[in-house]
Amino acid sequence: MKVGIVNDSALAVAALRRAIALDPAFEIVWVAGDGEQAVQLAASHTPDVILMDLLMPVMDGVEATRRIMAATPCPIVVVTTDLGRNATQVFDAMGHGAIDAVDTPTLTESDAKLTAGPLLRKMRNIGRLVAGRAAPRPAITEMPGTLAASRLVAIGASAGGPAALAKLLGALPADFCAAVVAVQHVDEAFAPGMADWLDSQCALPVRVAAPGETPQAGTVLIAGTNNHLRLLGSNRMAYTEQPSEYLYRPSIDVFFESVVEYWRGQAIGVLLTGMGRDGASGLKAMRDHGCLTIAQDQATSAVYGMPKAAAAMGAASEILPLTAIAPRLVQACCSVRPPPG
């Protein structure tokens, strides 16, 4: 797996080299000292993954991500020394198509393997994604529903998702009459900051879903751990380690499939921009179950992977530009009465 590094710090580059050397499957093919050089190298020697710093001279990582994803798209992981302090820039980069974010590994010998672990796990997942070796989806088992009838909008997003979620959720009215639950591929250390950022962009309250919480109309819940978020028959949200075979944690497919299993009110599935196929089979299960299902169109997707997979398998009953999704949700959820409980 060919790796490009974009970082102006010699110490950070040395730490990344040491971390990557722990896995012989990875090969560093170039190192860029700023975003402008990275854009040029990505165009001439496109790697399998780029490890992108944020704060650099000449051109920062956000602009470099935007240009690379527009010209020669490939998986980009933001690697920076302080995710929390650089949260705004991380969200901007993910809005332009960066697939994930992680702290820079340390160079200290005693901590090298420990701090390299999160980065290497993300890179291995990307390698499986690029190779098309995502784990097969287990069959859905129909189970008796116990949730009270209500309206639920289930949303999945990956690369480019934070910006897409901000636009979609920001266009929903404060009195939106359905519960909203979103699964965005992001590390658990970063989820609370993303929820706070989305909350500042929307009229609806946004927060990380807590174990045992019940989805409520007019509130947005965001998956907040590296386990799967799902509905259970107790009318509450839960985080579970199983199923273990899914490439992504949290998995959009797992959440969508739990909606099929347990939600007996009106449900709508929405699959936004993202790399790979996560969410496509779950969206198909929702459509087969009689739910309205929406996939973001190619023109407005930062990365047209997950919505493309959904469209190809007939999972989306409607394919819409991002700006049309919120009005469609309002029309579908708020212009009709919910089914009787």
From Swiss-Prot:
Residue numbers of 4-aspartylphosphate PTMs: D53
Superkingdom: Bacteria
One GO term describing the cellular component: cytoplasm
Pfam families reported in the protein's UniProt record: CheB_methylest, Response_reg
Positions of the catalytic residues: S158, H185, D278
Enzyme Commission (EC) number: 3.1.1.61, 3.5.1.44
PTM: Phosphorylated by CheA. Phosphorylation of the N-terminal regulatory domain activates the methylesterase activity.
Disulfide bonds: none
Keywords, in A-Z order: Chemotaxis, Cytoplasm, Hydrolase, Phosphoprotein
Domain spans labelled CheB-type methylesterase: 146-331
Domain called Response regulatory: residue spans: 2-119
Subcellular location: Cytoplasm
Assigned protein family: Belongs to the CheB family.
Purpose: Involved in chemotaxis. Part of a chemotaxis signal transduction system that modulates chemotaxis in response to various stimuli. Catalyzes the demethylation of specific methylglutamate residues introduced into the chemoreceptors (methyl-accepting chemotaxis proteins or MCP) by CheR. Also mediates the irreversible deamidation of specific glutamine residues to glutamic acid.
Name listed for the protein in its UniProt record: Protein-glutamate methylesterase/protein-glutamine glutaminase 1
Organism for this UniProt entry: Cupriavidus pinatubonensis (strain JMP 134 / LMG 1197) (Cupriavidus necator (strain JMP 134))
